[in-house]
Every structure is written in C-alpha cells, then in structure tokens.
Amino acid sequence: MRKIWLYTIALLVGGPAYAEPIKTILNCPFSDGTHALLLATSTLEGQKLFLKVDGNIQSAFSDMPNSDFVGQIVMAKCVASGLIFALNYGTPYSKGVLLRKNPISHATERIDFSEKALPRWLYVGRKQMRLVIPNSGYEVAAKFLIYDFVNAKGQPEEVEGVDTLPDKLGFKVLRLK
C-alpha cells in the first residue's frame, strides 16, 4: 500500500515534467508571404491544437474559447494559400477551421465548422470562401451543408443546407477529399 501511495505522489509531482512540448504539425504559406502554423501538444487523450499566425499563438478553436478540444487530427492540409484542419474530439463530430489571408485586403479570414463529415469541396474567390460538407447527420433536410465567409461580413451564424452543389462562377473549386 505504501508503494502505491508513493507512486501516486511521484506521478502528481512529476507529471508536468513529462508534458510534451508544442510540435509543429503543418506550416502553410499565405498569399501575402506570411505563414500559418498548426501546432499541437500531445496528451493521453489525444492532441490539443494551436495556431500561430502573425507571430501570435492561440487556441485553434477561438469560436469556443472556454472549451478544451482534445482528440485526433483527421484532416490537415495546406490548400489555396491557406490552412484547413479538423480534429475528431468525440464521436461522431469533427471540429475544424479553414484559415487564409484575403488576397486583396490581406486580412485573416476563417471559417469554423463542426459536422459529422469532413469538408469535401473548397470554393475560393477573391472576396469569399466557402466549404461544402456532405450532410451525413441530416439535422437539416439537405444533401450538403455550406459554410461561408464573405469579405467584410464574416461567417454567418447559420449553416446553409442545399441539395445541389453551389455554382462555380467566380470561384476556384478544389476537392479536399
């Protein structure tokens, strides 16, 4: 019994000394020549993600700052002068972010998403970006879910459900998966 007690105390005191440092998972160039770094620390439960943009490190999921998302990375890509990633933090949902700097204004733009399926298409325009995700959860009666970001307006509160893929006019369309 004494050995168990001593072992427990050693773990509590020495545990933080064994914490893994932040590692760079991906380094993606933006259109203005700067970079976005996806960073992670590893724990027993999985990975906790961070972003480094313009020299500042912050939690990857700034849309929910009081939540601590830990899980497995299921998507991480440099795409269209930006970064997209997703973390499976518990069945069945994945939470992710699409991040870029606008090619005209050089302002940082982001789309936060959380769905059962991963994004399949990225529509990139000079003033807008759009993620298209297959609707596998059917919380809305639609085949696809659209996450939008419009320059100067930001990301709408609600996700749009549609039955056909959006028009490609004015966009470069990239297949993500």
Task: Show the residue positions of the predicted features.
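Extracellular C-terminal loop/segment signatures of secreted glycoproteins
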Residues: 97-117
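N-terminal, post-signal-peptide region of Sec/Tat-exported proteins
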Residues: 42-78
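Acidic, small-residue rich beta-repeat scaffolds with periodic aromatic anchors
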Residues: 5, 20-43, 120-177
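Sec-dependent signal peptide recognition
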Residues: 2-10
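Structural motif
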Residues: 45-50, 91-99, 138-148
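Mid-chain, structured segments of secreted extracytoplasmic proteins
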Residues: 63-102
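Short coil/turn segments at the loop-to-beta-strand junctions that recur within blades
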Residues: 64-70, 112-119, 161-166
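N-terminal signal peptide c-region/cleavage motif recognized by signal peptidases
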Residues: 14-16
